[in-house]
Amino acid sequence: MTYRRHPANTRTINRAIAHLGLEIVRGYGYAYFVNKEGDQIGESVSVAYLSHQSVAGWVNDAILELERHYEVAYYPDRIVN
């Protein structure tokens, strides 16, 4: 999927990751992904402004966190930090 250069903000990021069943939530100095039930998926991303990363970068982060979340859920003994 190709993303045109739009400023990364909550609305544009959420539109871009909706197909993953996720949305982004902003905290103070960080952001994190939640699923439709409101459960946090993956680790928080330390960022001052959402626009410090492209929308495509946020999509990639969402995919990685989603994959890691389900890998931990199904294979907790395989995860090495």
Residue ranges of predicted features:
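Polybasic, low-complexity nucleic-acid-binding and compaction segments
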Residues: R11-A16, G27, G42-Y49
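Detector for the mature cores of small, proteolytically processed
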Residues: N35-N81
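Small/flexible residues
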Residues: H6-P7, Y28, V80
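Short linear loop/turn motifs
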Residues: G27-K36
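Negatively charged, low-complexity tracts enriched in Asp/Glu with abundant Ser/Thr
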Residues: M1-G21, Q53
